Swiss-Prot record:
InterPro entries per the UniProt record, alphabetical: Ribosome_biogenesis_Nop16 (IPR019002)
Cited function: Involved in the biogenesis of the 60S ribosomal subunit.
GO CC terms of this entry: nucleolus; preribosome, large subunit precursor
Keywords of the record: Nucleus, Ribonucleoprotein, Ribosome biogenesis, rRNA processing
PANTHER family xrefs: HSPC111 PROTEIN-RELATED, NUCLEOLAR PROTEIN 16
Organism in which the protein naturally occurs: Aspergillus niger (strain ATCC MYA-4892 / CBS 513.88 / FGSC A1513)
Protein's UniProt name: Nucleolar protein 16
Subunit note: Component of the pre-66S ribosomal particle.
Gene: nop16
Region (Disordered) location: 1-23, 214-239
């Protein structure tokens, strides 16, 4: 007979105890070893967060588009500017807004066919007449704060000498590893392949055509050229 207490446990909606998996955080996400690189480990500050450390080292901790905000710190010259993220891809709406900026232009047409011959664009500070008043093209409302706008001001990103040096070290390390990966490594024959080549040579000598037709010693139907290359490599390793 089934124990009543055990039957209630089976019907209970409470989660069962699971074995703790190593390598996971409390949130269930995989634990990432941020100190896997020796250069980053040497310059890591354990008193700072991951975002602060990566910003100080000149790295990006997240490849997605930036969202939210961060506190701006005051400096001697004003408020420090954050470096622009080179991996951020601007949305199509921003690009479309720049392309479709409204402006007045003059068009020169052919008097006979009516085709457009030339498009004359006025300067930004050119005066145009709107409602009987002459105003500047880039400031039709005569806004006194328009000249103080920061559209033409380019904020200089914060220069971090130590961060730039670390980035250069990481780039050199990545370049060296890339060269070693791209380098062609010679293939070494295994012991079983050497024994197989030895049996072929003992039976057929230099007759590569007979080796290719031998169904017992060559069940995978290797071609004459492939067998010749394997035997040449075997002889070079023995010499």
């Amino acid at each position: 007979m089934v124990n009543i207490r055990q039957a209630k446990k089976k019907r209970s909606s409470l989660p069962k105890a699971k074995a703790k998996r190593s390598g996971l955080l409390k949130s269930g996400k995989k634990k990432i070893n941020v100190l896997g690189n020796a250069i980053i480990a040497e310059n890591w500050d354990r008193k700072q967060t991951l975002t602060q450390n990566y910003r100080r080292l000149g790295l990006v901790h997240r490849l997605n588009a930036p969202s939210g905000g961060s506190q701006k710190r005051a400096t001697v010259n004003g408020i420090e500017g954050e470096p622009e993220d080179s991996l951020y891809i601007k949305s199509s709406t921003e690009a479309l807004a720049k392309q479709t900026a409204t402006s007045d232009i003059k068009v020169e047409r052919d008097p006979e066919t009516g085709k457009i011959l030339r498009v004359i664009r006025g300067a930004a500070d050119e005066e145009v007449e709107i409602a009987g008043r002459k105003v500047k093209r880039n400031n039709p409302l005569n806004d006194p704060l328009n000249d103080l706008s920061n559209h033409g001001i380019v904020t200089q990103p914060r220069q971090n000498a130590s961060g730039n040096a670390i980035v250069e070290q990481l780039e050199r390390q990545a370049a060296q590893e890339g060269v070693s990966v791209r380098a062609k490594k010679p293939r070494h024959q295994s012991q079983r392949e050497e024994e197989w080549v030895t049996r072929l040579i003992e039976k057929h000598g230099d007759n590569y055509a007979a080796m290719a037709r031998d169904r017992r010693l060559n069940p995978m139907q290797q071609t004459e050229g492939d067998l010749k290359r394997r035997i040449r490599k075997f002889q070079q390793s023995r010499s």
